[in-house]
Design a protein with these regions (language model features):
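Core alpha/beta structural scaffold of self-assembling particle/tube/pore-forming proteins
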Residues: 3-32, 45, 72-80, 85-341
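N-terminal low-complexity, intrinsically disordered segments
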Residues: 41-72
Length: 341
């Protein structure tokens, strides 16, 4: 399959500028660059998933066979417009020998913000927000979720709604499974830089304007979960109930046996990955008794590669998700273990 990085190399000059920014900043949102990309002509398309295949039986001679057809479920996948205006005051650009670099740096920053926005939207959505695509947990199949907390394993309404703690996702990537969708036969593109007047408040907070160099980063974006077996989720991960090899092994059993070898990644954030690492104790053969130590930084679990991302939250309660979307700016990454200087 093609990833966003593959596609950007084939598109026009505006996309190549995005590619330059992605190469320096995209690792903060690796799911956006690692997941497959499907480009479509418009901004939506219909997909048909198989809800059940007929059980073909045997019959004696001269007896009729039951007429059964495959059961299908239809749904529409939509792309939504992502729009990142870029503007730098001409006075700043022309007064500095590094003015051109300032414009390039702002372009990279806006690109990083766009990728972080797509990444956050991949995993979360506010229920009332109709201007963005449904997130992965809304689209994934029923009965593809387990809890890391043994007290929340029973299939009840309360346990289904409980999103406290963090999550890790097992994903199968591909056009028939989990992939991003980009509309209008384009991904993200930068419009040519131009000089124009833009509105800006004066120092006295009155209406005014400045001359600025402007551009736009724009595209039509969505995500599709085309198979009920494309994604499995392990939720309610906390320090008391960390991610373990055993939990991932259990989550693998949610997939049909023929598909378990197709799982592309276990997607998790750094704190969840650290918790997994701490559960893996090793005992060196020192000859001085059993002295255990923490295992090395894991790159796989149950023979599935780990994709570490910053976009998955440590607490996925509604309050925490709302707080993440309430911010106008993505702050520099900060571990939840860190102390302020």
């Amino acid at each position: 399959y093609m990833t966003l990085l593959d596609v950007l190399q084939q598109e026009g000059p505006g996309s190549l500028k995005v590619l330059d920014a992605v190469r320096s900043l995209g690792l903060s949102s690796p799911e956006v660059t690692a997941f497959p990309v499907t480009k479509i002509d418009g901004t939506s398309y219909e997909i048909t998933t198989v809800a059940g295949v007929p059980r073909i039986g045997y019959r004696p001679p001269n007896a009729g066979a039951k007429n059964l057809n495959t059961r299908h479920t239809n749904k529409t996948v939509k792309c939504y417009y992502i729009d990142g205006p870029i503007e730098v005051d001409k006075a700043i650009v022309t007064s500095s020998k590094n003015g051109a670099k300032l414009l390039a740096k702002e372009t990279k920053n806006v690109t990083a913000g766009a990728f972080a926005s797509v990444a956050l939207q991949t995993w979360y959505r506010l229920k009332e927000d109709e201007d963005v695509f449904p997130c992965v947990s809304e689209q994934m199949g029923d009965y593809m979720t387990i809890s890391a907390d043994p007290s929340k394993r029973e299939d009840t309404e309360a346990n289904r709604a409980d999103n406290s703690g963090a999550s890790a996702y097992l994903v199968i990537l591909g056009d028939d499974f989990l992939h991003y969708v980009w509309g209008k036969q384009m991904t993200l593109s930068l419009s040519p830089v131009k000089e124009e007047r833009v509105s800006r408040k004066t120092k006295n907070e009155e209406e005014g304007s400045i001359t600025a160099y402007t551009s736009r980063l724009e595209g039509w974006n969505g995500i599709a979960v085309e198979s009920p077996y494309a994604v499995a989720r392990i939720k309610n991960i906390t320090p008391e109930h960390p991610l373990t090899d055993e939990l991932v092994a259990e989550a693998k059993t949610l997939f049909p046996s023929a598909m378990r070898g197709m799982i592309s990644y276990v997607v998790m954030n750094g704190i969840v990955k650290l918790g997994l690492q701490k559960t893996r104790r090793i005992t060196p053969g020192t000859g001085n008794g059993a002295t255990s130590m923490i295992a090395t930084d894991p790159d796989s679990v149950q023979n599935i590669k780990i994709l570490e991302v910053d976009s998955l939250l440590n607490d996925e309660s509604e309050e925490s998700v709302r707080a993440a979307f309430a911010e106008d700016y993505f702050k520099a990454y900060r571990s939840s273990l860190a102390l302020k200087n």
